[in-house]
Regions:
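Active-site pre-lysine segment of PLP-dependent enzymes
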Residues: 1-10, 15-50, 63
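PLP-dependent enzyme catalytic core of the Aspartate aminotransferase-like
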Residues: 140-141, 148-158, 164-204
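Conserved core segment of the aminotransferase class I/II
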Residues: 37-106, 113-115
Length: 204
C-alpha cells in the first residue's frame, strides 16, 4: 500500500476467498479498508457456494465504478430477477453460510495435515486462507503423466501442477466431502508405495 501511495497507483485485489479464514470467525480487513484507491472484487461463487448465480461485486473509487457501470451496460445490462432474489437471500444469511464454509475448510485442512505427517513422498505448506493448495510430490515424474497414471489406476484425480506452471505439484481443494477426501488420500498413499525407493529432492 505504501508503494502504491507513493506513486499514486491503484491496487486491484480479488478477495473471492475472503471469509474462510479458518483461524478466526471475524472477517479480515479488505484492501479497501486501508487504501482509497483500492479496487476489490468478490462473488457468490466460492465462499458462499453459489457459483450458479454468476453474481459478484466490485468496490472501488467512484470514478472507477462509473467506468465499470458504463462498460457493464454493454456486456450484461442486467441480471435475472430470480438470481437477484436468491443472491439477497444468500447475503441475508451470510454468517451461517460463511461458518459452514469455514467449518468444511477447517475439517479438511486438518485431515490433509494428518495425512501429510504420515506420507513421506508428499509435502505442502497449507495456506491460512483460501480453499486450495498445491501438494509437492518428491518424484521425478511430470505432473500431467503422474496425474493421468494415478487416475487410470485408482480413479483419484488431481489437476497437474503443469497447468499452473508449477511442475511436480498437484492442485488440491479443501471443499470436497470429508469422506471423499479421506478415502481419496488413503487410496493415493497406497498407490504411492510403488515409488518408495524413487524419492528424490526436486529443485524448484
Amino acid at each position: 500500500i505504501k508503494l502504491a501511495q507513493k506513486y499514486d497507483c491503484y491496487i486491484l485485489c480479488d478477495e473471492i476467498y475472503r471469509g474462510v479464514d479458518t483461524e478466526s470467525l471475524e472477517l479480515y480487513p479488505s484492501f479497501s479498508d486501508y487504501y482509497d484507491k483500492a479496487i476489490v472484487t468478490q462473488s457468490l461463487s466460492k465462499v458462499f457456494s453459489f457459483a450458479g448465480l454468476r453474481l459478484g461485486w466490485i468496490k472501488g473509487p467512484q470514478e472507477v465504478i462509473d467506468l465499470v457501470n458504463y462498460r457493464r451496460d454493454y456486456h450484461i445490462i442486467s441480471s435475472g430477477p430470480l438470481d437477484d432474489y436468491l443472491a439477497c437471500l444468500v447475503l441475508e444469511n451470510k454468517d451461517v453460510i460463511l461458518k459452514r464454509s469455514r467449518d468444511i475448510c477447517q475439517t479438511n485442512k486438518l485431515i490433509l495435515k494428518k495425512w501429510l505427517d504420515q506420507e513421506p513422498l508428499v509435502s505442502c505448506v497449507i495456506p491460512r486462507h483460501g480453499t486450495v493448495c498445491f501438494l509437492h510430490y518428491h518424484l521425478d515424474i511430470p505432473s500431467a503423466e503422474f496425474c493421468e497414471k494415478l487416475q487410470k489406476e485408482t480413479g483419484v484425480f488431481f489437476v497437474p501442477g503443469s497447468a499452473f506452471d508449477i511442475e511436480y505439484h498437484l492442485r488440491f481443494g479443501f471443499t470436497q466431502d470429508e469422506k471423499i477426501i479421506k478415502e481419496g488420500l488413503i487410496t493415493f498413499s497406497k498407490w504411492l508405495r510403488q515409488f518408495d525407493h524413487q524419492s528424490i529432492d526436486i529443485q524448484l
